[in-house]
Regions:
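N-terminal acidic, glycine/proline-rich low-complexity segments
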Residues: 12-428
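Bacterial N-terminal signal peptides
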Residues: 1-6
Length: 428
């Protein structure tokens, strides 16, 4: 077995929570939804709960995930708590974590992007308004609806917020809430990681014990209740696609997203990422991959707002539509660079079966090289080809530190199995 961290050629970033800076953190997660990796990332997050001031864990869309799935992981944490607290008195008690686990939105609010307050959105507002002068870091692992609702209900909290959004597929499912934030709160301090997060499980050193399956088998299996629970997800293979948001706060310079760290290195966002069509499109129509596509199509003669409409992209993804009696409006965020087909289903015969497609393509260099003046604090995956892992922009800025963050994770996981001794504390 390779000695963990041996041979690491890059020095670990020396800032962040592991260097002693305590960050206020809320996690918004679609745990229990469509991707089991949120369970893995929650295990990872709780193992570092002693170095954060954890203020909330919110269940968010998309999918069937609920607060009870957060509690499921906290139950495992409770079984390991006796050992964990011997390493640090600052691990929160299981009941303290249960008290701040909140239910957020259950589904998208529709094209407006906002709807009614939820327990989760109200909790974000409450935490942001507290007297603590430190910023509040909101790590969004799933849908961004609760953050959008919080900003809508209390726009004055914006200066306090620092957001790390695991975008990509989550942005696709939450496009209306994303559109609301981007249009109405452009000065929000946010990192939009559409592909950078993939560096946690794609590329980097995957030889020997560093492989996604071999690492889990060697360093997570049999390490307490949390380790065993981790192994029940994704057949015991590391994905942890939301963990870069945690790594960003653990090691790096969270005040400056352009600097390297465990959660990646980012670039200022550019303009022109949203495309609006007033017609059905063809393959010759191009939009930006991971951008926003909006259709505002005049209703055909004879159609009224009482007629029903459903738009399905890629034969599987339904878009929420509005029909105001004059215009049919719907949005989509293409999560990959490819041709995206869509079809309209309606009880209005002239519209039913109408279809189209468009090509999502990477943005040109002349666009990405001009930072947006409208969004001065909005950051995104580094478009530099040298930072890409295959087709994933920015992913190398994470995976080049794979041995560091996985090695540290393995050391943390050992805490679950064995109580601390004076010797083990010194080694860590």
């Amino acid at each position: 077995m390779l000695p963990l961290l041996a041979g690491t050629v890059r020095a670990a970033p020396d800032g962040g929570a592991l260097a002693g800076r305590r960050h206020r953190v809320i996690v918004s997660t679609d745990i229990g939804g469509t991707d089991p990796d949120d369970f893995q990332s929650m295990v990872h997050f709780l193992l570092y709960a002693d170095v954060f001031d954890v203020e909330g864990i919110i269940s968010s869309p998309y999918g069937p995930g609920r607060r009870e799935h957060i509690l499921q992981v906290i139950d495992c944490y409770e079984r390991d708590f006796a050992n964990l607290k011997t390493y640090s008195a600052r691990y929160p008690t299981p009941n303290a974590l249960r008290a701040i686990a909140k239910q957020g939105a259950l589904e998208g609010p529709g094209p407006a992007g906002v709807g009614k307050p939820t327990e989760g959105s109200d909790w974000i507002v409450r935490c942001a308004r507290c007297a603590d002068r430190r910023p509040l870091h909101v790590l969004v692992w799933g849908g961004i609806e609760d953050l959008a609702q919080a900003l809508h209900d209390a726009p004055g909290i914006l200066p306090k917020l620092r957001v790390y959004f695991i975008g990509g597929p989550n942005k696709m499912w939450s496009v209306d809430a994303y559109n609301y934030i981007e249009r109405n709160h452009p000065k929000l301090r946010i990192i939009e990681a559409n592909t950078t997060y993939r560096g946690w499980f794609t590329g980097g050193n995957q030889a020997g014990e560093w492989g996604n399956a071999s690492f889990a088998a060697a360093h997570l299996a049999g390490r307490g209740a949390l380790g065993d629970f981790f192994m029940t997800q994704l057949k015991g293979t590391v994905k942890m696609g939301d963990s870069p948001s945690v790594g960003y706060l653990l090691r790096g310079t969270p005040e400056d997203p352009s600097q390297p760290g465990w959660g990646g290195k980012f670039a200022r966002i550019w303009d022109g990422r949203k495309t609006v069509f007033d017609r059905l499109t063809t393959e010759s129509d191009q939009v930006e991959a991971f951008g926003v596509v909006e259709f505002a199509i005049p209703l055909p003669a004879g159609m009224t707002r009482e007629n029903s409409v459903r738009v399905v992209f890629d034969n599987r993804i339904s878009a929420i539509t509005t029909n105001d009696g004059r215009t049919l409006r719907f949005r989509f965020s293409p999560r990959d660079a490819k041709v995206w087909p869509y079809v309209i289903h309606s009880d209005f015969a002239a519209l039913n079966g109408q279809s189209g497609k468009f090509a999502a393509v990477p943005p040109p260099a002349e666009r990405t090289g001009r930072p947006s003046k409208v969004h001065p604090n909005w950051w995104i995956d580094d478009p530099d080809p040298a930072a890409a892992e295959g087709i994933h922009p920015g992913a190398k800025s994470v995976n080049r530190r794979r041995e560091q963050f996985l090695g540290d994770f393995a050391a943390r996981m050992r805490r679950c199995k064995t109580a601390a001794t004076k010797t083990s504390k010194v080694k860590e």
